[in-house]
UniProtKB/Swiss-Prot annotation:
Keyword annotations: Nucleus, Repeat, WD repeat
Comp. bias regions, Acidic residues: 369-378
Annotated WD repeat ranges: 9-48, 66-105, 114-155, 218-259, 268-311, 315-352
Protein name: WD repeat-containing protein JIP5
Subcellular localization, as worded in the UniProt entry: Nucleus, Nucleolus
Stretch list, region Disordered: 150-187, 348-413
InterPro entries xref list: WD40/YVTN_repeat-like_dom_sf (IPR015943), WD40_repeat_dom_sf (IPR036322), WDR55_POC1 (IPR050505)
Chief localisation class: nucleus
Family statement: Belongs to the WD repeat WDR55 family.
GO CC, alphabetical: nucleolus
Annotated Low complexity bias: 170-183
Bias-annotated ranges (Basic residues): 384-397
Length: 413
């Protein structure tokens, strides 16, 4: 279904990946705390740097040591002008997507009441609107920040905080705005955490929490345009679990799952389904979900017939940490210390010489120097412990606290 056309080595393990909504830009957040943005070739042969087969040069737009610990999550703003990053150091930073220059810092609320309380590491970040971001954490909190409120030299409190889960929030998916919405932005969000899903209204709080599903729920994506009939509205939430099974949830019936699709079948349980992404309508037939697994494979599941129709391998050792599609419809997969770009496979009448020429045309691009001249950290060069994926296994004990206090911080200088 897809052919790999280039591979991009990274300096350390990938923890987060974000794809620009309108430009061929990919941002990565690394275990070292670095954030780096790449410009990939245009998907057509009319743009600068493109070649006849869609290949060209991958350039580093900017690179910096953004966080003093691992970068846990990334997200572009609605208009793509801002890149938000959140790190295990307890900071959220907003930077210009084009240059990487930071223009806003926010402290993630800590656990406890003292000045030395534990950091509550972030897990997922999303831009709700140009003025608002939503951030989830390891403790199961959901923080809403209004960026129009100028940050204080002392603290920046979230405008609202909800607690949809007792375990860490593993995914965060918006529900489509209602037909009566005047803003056009999502007000209700579905989260997965531990063994449940929850629906939270950002104005009214947690609306509903599902029954215990007896397995860890890892990832989610919302799909519209499915066949409606009977009680089905043609809209479903697709959730990836830790045992290789996708569950489908009917909109409005959030107490329990509606259907199950076995994606990875193994005698002792399948691989964890780490990340889900919906294929663009221009690719394939019907609604197809790309499923990134913990074993480095990406499987493609067609909804309706509810079966796996294709598979590619990103890496044979490291799991998938990032997966999505750029403005040109190319799939971008990330995991371990490599990012790969994939084009939709094209059926060819001939083989042999032409196919061999195409294989030789595929290139491996190596990024530039690790030297970072645009470091916004005051403790540059501090040695970081290399950390593996942030995923926790079901049943691991966690310290819980209801206290939501904000870490004080100085100005942007």
């Amino acid at each position: 279904m897809f052919d790999n056309v280039c591979s991009l080595p990274l300096s350390s393990d990938l923890f987060a990946q974000a794809i620009h909504p309108t430009e061929p830009l990919v941002a990565v957040g690394l275990s070292s705390g670095h954030v780096q943005t790449f410009r990939i070739p245009p998907s057509s042969d009319s743009g600068p740097g493109a070649t006849k087969n869609g290949l060209g040069h991958i350039d580093t737009a900017w690179r910096t040591r953004r966080h003093k610990a691992s970068c846990r999550c990334l997200g572009f703003g609605i208009d793509g002008q801002t890149l938000y990053s959140a790190g295990a150091d307890g900071w959220v930073k907003a930077a210009k997507a084009e240059t990487g220059v930071v223009n806003l810092k926010i402290a993630v609320p800590r656990l406890g009441e003292g000045t030395h309380d534990r950091i509550d590491p972030p897990t997922v970040i999303h831009a709700i609107s140009p003025e608002t971001i939503i951030l989830s954490t390891d403790s199961g909190a959901l923080h809403l920040f209004d960026l129009r409120v100028p940050p204080s030299p002392v603290s920046q409190r979230p405008q609202q905080t909800h607690h949809p889960h007792d375990d860490y929030v593993s995914s965060l998916t918006p529900l489509p705005p209602s037909e009566t919405s005047t803003s056009g932005f999502s007000k209700q969000w579905v989260t997965t955490g531990g063994t449940t899903i929850a629906v939270t209204d950002l104005r009214r709080g947690v609306l509903v929490r599902s029954e215990d599903q007896d397995e860890e729920l890892i990832s989610s994506v919302y799909v519209t345009g499915l066949k409606a009939g009977g009680t089905s509205r043609g809209e479903k939430l697709v959730v990836g679990g830790a045992s290789g099974v996708l569950t489908l949830w009917e909109k409005g019936a959030w107490d329990d799952q509606d259907e199950r699709i076995i994606v990875d079948r193994q005698p002792d349980g399948g691989e964890s389904l780490e990340i889900l992404s919906l294929l663009p309508d221009s690719i394939g037939a019907g609604k197809v979900v790309a499923v990134g697994q913990s074993d480095g494979a990406v499987q493609f599941v067609q909804l309706g017939v509810n079966k796996v129709i294709s598979k590619v391998v990103h890496d044979e050792l490291e799991g998938i940490a990032g997966l999505g599609f750029d403005v040109g419809g190319r799939m971008i997969s990330g995991g371990g210390s490599i990012v790969k770009v994939w084009h939709e496979a094209v059926e060819r009448e001939g083989h042999g010489e032409n196919e061999e020429d195409e294989q030789h045309s595929r290139k491996r691009f190596v990024m530039g120097s690790d030297d970072d001249g645009n470091d916004d950290s005051s403790v540059d060069g501090q040695k970081q412990n290399k950390k593996k994926r942030k995923k926790r296994k079901k049943g691991k004990s966690k310290d819980k606290s209801d206290g939501q206090h904000v870490m004080a911080f100085k100005g942007l200088d």
